Amino acid sequence: MAMAKALLFAILGCLCLCSAVLAARELSDDAAMAARHERWMAQYGRVYRDDAEKARRFEVFKANVAFIESFNAGNHNFWLGVNQFADLTNDEFRWTKTNKGFIPSTTRVPTGFRYENVNIDALPATVDWRTKGAVTPIKDQGQCGCCWAFSAVAAMEGIVKLSTGKLISLSEQELVDCDVHGEDQGCEGGLMDDAFKFIIKNGGLTTESNYPYAAADDKCKSVSNSVASIKGYEDVPANNEAALMKAVANQPVSVAVDGGDMTFQFYKGGVMTGSCGTDLDHGIVAIGYGKASDGTKYWLLKNSWGTTWGENGFLRMEKDISDKRGMCGLAMEPSYPTA
């Protein structure tokens, strides 16, 4: 009897000790995570309005870090990272326009497609317009839903380089402030095709340095010194990755994607594969294509979320998938300016 009691006390003592160790470990883990959150706040300049908001955001941050680490422990072709969106729930990220801003087209007026008769078998196996000097450095749209302007400008910067030999960083802010009489509404969203229409009517765009980006809507400033122009624009036939390849082989192309998935939110590197939505909400630019070391074919894309997102601001998404709409819908509404 005495031995049984002693054994019971020993077991209870072990359980209490284990519980204490686990509790201490949880406190230690929480303290480490809190310190990580503080470092993240400093890195991205995040300031919360009060302690309650900070506590809530910390819980979101902690959950997102757990998701990222769990995903990266799996068998995937790409990986995730803790970036500037780490204190947003996916619902917040998905429904906010502050980091995206593409408005899907309800009706697309048919245009020509100058690359229709290009022999796809004669195209290069890989294309990267960065190596041809046709891509400006990564930009950051910040808290303004004007991805449409960044996408249109990047595509225009590319064709201007290819047609004139000059790579010029052009003004997104001119579009944000001045292209407001149609579908495009500055930080509230817009369409790349409408941006191209405005640029044609406006006689071009001025430079980034002459009309710098402000990440906010403002009054249109009178600028008469447009430094680059386009003659028109064309839509790539929808839901046709082969047609998109023909276009991208010849110039950077604006594309729209569904950028709301958590894997897109926290994308860090590799070739994005797997399931993805097609509710288009974000405009980016296809600047090439290629094949990864494991044989996976991919599109090379330029985003406008700064260099801390993705592969220094760029993204690779699987190419030629079974869904004709393309990965995250990127083949649904591609277009490009003409010079």
Curated annotation (Swiss-Prot):
Cleavable signal peptide:
1-23
For this protein, the record's CDD domains field holds: Peptidase_C1A
Alphabetical keyword list: Disulfide bond, Hydrolase, Protease, Signal, Thiol protease, Vacuole
Record: active site: C147, H282, N303
Q: Which GO terms describe its biological process?
A: leaf senescence; programmed cell death involved in cell development; proteolysis; response to abscisic acid; response to ethylene; response to gibberellin
Matching entries from SMART domains are given as: Inhibitor_I29, Pept_C1
Q: Select a single GO molecular function from the record's annotations and give it.
A: cysteine-type peptidase activity
The protein's location, in the record's own words, is:
Vacuole
Any single GO CC term annotated in Swiss-Prot or TrEMBL for this entry: senescence-associated vacuole
Q: According to the UniProt record, which cysteines are disulfide-bonded?
A: C144-C187, C178-C220, C276-C328
- EC code(s) of this entry: 3.4.22.-
The organism's place on the tree of life at top rank: Eukaryota
Q: Which InterPro entries match?
A: Papain-like_cys_pep_sf, Pept_asp_AS, Pept_cys_AS, Pept_his_AS, Peptidase_C1A, Peptidase_C1A_C, Peptidase_C1A_papain-like, Prot_inhib_I29
Report the PANTHER family cross-referenced here.
CYSTEINE PROTEASE FAMILY C1-RELATED (PTHR12411)
- Tell me, in a sentence or two, what this protein's role is: Cysteine protease that may have a developmental senescence specific cell death function during apoptosis, heavy metal detoxification, and hypersensitive response.
UniProt lists the family membership as follows:
Belongs to the peptidase C1 family.
Q: What is this protein called?
A: Senescence-specific cysteine protease SAG39
| Organism whose genome encodes this protein | Oryza sativa subsp. indica
